[in-house]
C-alpha cells in the first residue's frame, strides 16, 4: 500500500533518508531497484518529493521519486562526468562568502553560473560584515555581479542585516545555502530561524579557517515563511553545464559579447570579437577574461564527457535488448 500524499526528503545520511510527511517524520531506506538501479545523481536528495510505504510507526521504504524540478548539481569530486545532486525544488540559492580571507569573486562567479544553469535565483550573501574589511574594494569586485543579482552584507551580530535578509525570503520559498567551510552558513540559518536549529563551530585560531560543522544537507522550516536547506562547506565546486556557450551570457564579458560580429562567437580567436578587443585595449581586465576561459574549458570538458557517457550507455542498453530478444526467440 502506497501512501497517497507526496512526502519530502528532509535529510539524507548515507543510505538512510528522513522524510517529512503529514503524519510526522519517517526514517526511510530505498528499495533495491532504486538503490542499485540508479546513478548517484539520480538518488533522492534533500528537497525531492517521494512516495513511500510505511512498515513501522516511524519507518518506511521509499518506492518512487517524483520528477525533479530546479535541482542544483555539482560535479562529483574526483570524476570526469559524474554529477551530484545537492538539493531539489530550490527557488533561491544564497551564495555565502565571508568578508575575510575567504572572499573570492571568481568563486562567486563559479557558484552563480551553476545556479543560473538550473533556473534558480542566485543571491550573494557577504557574511561577517562586522569584521574590518575594505568595503570599497569588495564593492568594486562585485560591481558587475551586483548588477545581475541581489547582494546582502550580513552579520549575526548586526540584527538589522539579518532582518533584511529574512525579508528577502517569500512565503513558501525554498532557499539553499552554498559556500565554503567557515563562512557562517549554519549560523545564518539559526539567525533567520531565530533559534538554534543547526550545530555551529568557531573558526580555528591557528589556521583562521572554518571547521566542517554541517556534514550533511539538512532542511529546516522558518517560523513564518520559507524553507532553508543548509549544506556542508565545499572545497571545490565543479561545473555541470550542458552548453558552455551560455557562460558568456552571465559573466562580466556579456557587456562586450553583445557587440561581437558573429552571434555564435565563442570569444576565443574569432574575427570581430568585441570581447578580445576589450581585453587587448585594456578596457576588460584580463583576469576576468581568463576566468571565463577557465570556466568554459571546464564546462566543455564535462559536456563532452557527459555526451560520450550517454553514447556508451545507449550502446550498452541496445546490446542488452538484443541479447533479450535473442533469448526470447529461441
Model-derived regions: residue spans:
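Short aromatic-glycine-enriched beta-strand elements
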Residues: 15-19
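Helix-rich effector regions associated with P-loop NTPase G domains
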Residues: 39-56, 67-86, 92, 121-122, ...
Amino acid at each position: 500500500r502506497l501512501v497517497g500524499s507526496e512526502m519530502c526528503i528532509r535529510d539524507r545520511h548515507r543510505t538512510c533518508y528522513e522524510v517529512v510527511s503529514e503524519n510526522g517524520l519517517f526514517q526511510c531506506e530505498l528499495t533495491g531497484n532504486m538503490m542499485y538501479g540508479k546513478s548517484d545523481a539520480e538518488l533522492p536528495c534533500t528537497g525531492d518529493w517521494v512516495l513511500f510505504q510505511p512498515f513501522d510507526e516511524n519507518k518506511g521504504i521509499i518506492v518512487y521519486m517524483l520528477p525533479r524540478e530546479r535541482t542544483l548539481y555539482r560535479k562529483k569530486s574526483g570524476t570526469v562526468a559524474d554529477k551530484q545532486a545537492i538539493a531539489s525544488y530550490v527557488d533561491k540559492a544564497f551564495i555565502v562568502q565571508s568578508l575575510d580571507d575567504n572572499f573570492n569573486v571568481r568563486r562567486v562567479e563559479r557558484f552563480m553560473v551553476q545556479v543560473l544553469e538550473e533556473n534558480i535565483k542566485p543571491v550573494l550573501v557577504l557574511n561577517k560584515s562586522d569584521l574590518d574589511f575594505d568595503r570599497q574594494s569588495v564593492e568594486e569586485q562585485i560591481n558587475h555581479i551586483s548588477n545581475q543579482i541581489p547582494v546582502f552584507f550580513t552579520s549575526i551580530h548586526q540584527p538589522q542585516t539579518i532582518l533584511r535578509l529574512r525579508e528577502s525570503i517569500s512565503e513558501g520559498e525554498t532557499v539553499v545555502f552554498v559556500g565554503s567551510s567557515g563562512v557562517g552558513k549554519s549560523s545564518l540559518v539559526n539567525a533567520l530561524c531565530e533559534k538554534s536549529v543547526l550545530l555551529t563551530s568557531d573558526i580555528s585560531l591557528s589556521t583562521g579557517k572554518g571547521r566542517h560543522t554541517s556534514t550533511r544537507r539538512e532542511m529546516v522550516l522558518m517560523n513564518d515563511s520559507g524553507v532553508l536547506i543548509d549544506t556542508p562547506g565545499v572545497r571545490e565546486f565543479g561545473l555541470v553545464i550542458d552548453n558552455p556557450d551560455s557562460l558568456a551570457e552571465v559573466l562580466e564579458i556579456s557587456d562586450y559579447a553583445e557587440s561581437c560580429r558573429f552571434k555564435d562567437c565563442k570569444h576565443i580567436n574569432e574575427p570581430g570579437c568585441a570581447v578580445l578587443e576589450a581585453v587587448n585595449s585594456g578596457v576588460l581586465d584580463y583576469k576576468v577574461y581568463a576566468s571565463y576561459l577557465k570556466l568554459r574549458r571546464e564546462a566543455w570538458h564535462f559536456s563532452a564527457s557527459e555526451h560520450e557517457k550517454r553514447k556508451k550507455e545507449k550502446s550498452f542498453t541496445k546490446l542488452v535488448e538484443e541479447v533479450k530478444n535473442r533469448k526470447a526467440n529461441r
